[in-house]
Amino acid sequence: MGFLWTGSWILVLVLNSGPIQAFPKPEGSQDKSLHNRELSAERPLNEQIAEAEADKIKKTYPSESKPSESNFSSVDNLNLLKAITEKETVEKAKQSIRSSPFDNRLNVDDADSTKNRKLTDEYDSTKSGLDRKVQDDPDGLHQLDGTPLTAEDIVHKIATRIYEENDRGVFDKIVSKLLNLGLITESQAHTLEDEVAEALQKLISKEANNYEEAPEKPTSRTENQDGKIPEKVTPVAATQDGFTNRENDDTVSNTLTLSNGLERRTNPHRDDDFEELQYFPNFYALLTSIDSEKEAKEKETLITIMKTLIDFVKMMVKYGTISPEEGVSYLENLDETIALQTKNKLEKNTTDSKSKLFPAPPEKSHEETDSTKEEAAKMEKEYGSLKDSTKDDNSNLGGKTDEAKGKTEAYLEAIRKNIEWLKKHNKKGNKEDYDLSKMRDFINQQADAYVEKGILDKEEANAIKRIYSSL
């Protein structure tokens, strides 16, 4: 009974609830027309504003169901800002490095706060600032106080470096770097070359004068026992005595003839000079054949004249007076002519000196058997020499002067002939060919410089000037 009562109640509830739709029905005609109107027609402005404000509110106050996503987005924004800031810092640092290499270290130290800017070095009273010179000024273009060097200081510094390293290639290396960096032009390079050459010449002359004015002291073995070797050269008289009385005086062998860097620079016939003269086979063969001490003076003079002529040809090619081919042809003729004439002259002088030192023995006669007559002849000869010693001395001095003058004229005769040959082979015919004023000035400067260095005698220099001034 109870079961039937319950079933009736369920049936009543089902009937009252209405028809149940198992599948959704499509919207009516009104809904479809509204949808088409929304697609085709523009919505009212008020609706658009309201919808935009609703979207803004949703973005401003996100739902609490996704707190982690909002946190992640804020973290990403912070990382992006940091990355941009670091990138800008790096770009600024690179620009500062490119713009001023000297301030590179200061910019890096300012950007990095963890560095102490070398406080121990700055507050160390034992250091004078020279220890940091290499670090702060690697190129050496600034003074100790940080101010940049002037043009004269740079020229003097380059000349000093060439003088210290004894290498002409130092200037070429420096100029090539400056040209590659675009810091100077070709004309400025030529101007710098002239200024450096002038400064170097003044420096060499100054050092040579200081070297000559310094007191010269002879050194012996007893003075050098403590290991201290003086830099001064022994007097010339002691050296000459060492050559003349080497077998008789044993103390001369204890005398040291030392040479410092200045003497090596002023010596015109070093190994590197011989390397330059190897391109002239005849002349080089002549130099290697001259080894005697007596001919050392002639050898120095010969090398000086040859190198002066080589520089003269280089200058003519540089100024466009002659072509490089003509310069090469001139040097070939110069090599052959000077070598041949000098060799003949030296051989003649050698035979004359040998005949004076070793005269031919006279034929024996009956008078030589008489010792009394021989002793009488010797005494008479000695008396005659003592009677008029002044005349003999004057004649000897005159003979030496004539002999030296003859050698000099022999050397310079080769120069005169080669210059005449050079004039005959002139092919340009311009009015400015063979600018003799420039040539005379150059030769005069070189001759004076060689006289100051002690390479040439004053008479030889005057003879060279006289020949070039007579052209």
Curated annotation (Swiss-Prot):
Main location: cytoplasm
Localization of this protein: Cytoplasmic vesicle, Secretory vesicle; Cytoplasmic vesicle, Secretory vesicle membrane; Secreted
Tissue: Expression restricted to the brain and pituitary gland. Not detected in the adrenal gland.
Start and end residues of each stretch annotated as Disordered: 24-73, 92-145, 208-231, 345-405
Record PTM Phosphoserine, positions in chain: 40, 365
PANTHER family: SECRETOGRANIN III (PTHR17388), SECRETOGRANIN-3 (PTHR17388:SF2)
Protein name, entry field: Secretogranin-3
Phylogenetic placement of the source organism: Eukaryota, Metazoa, Chordata, Craniata, Vertebrata
Gene transcribed to yield this protein: Scg3
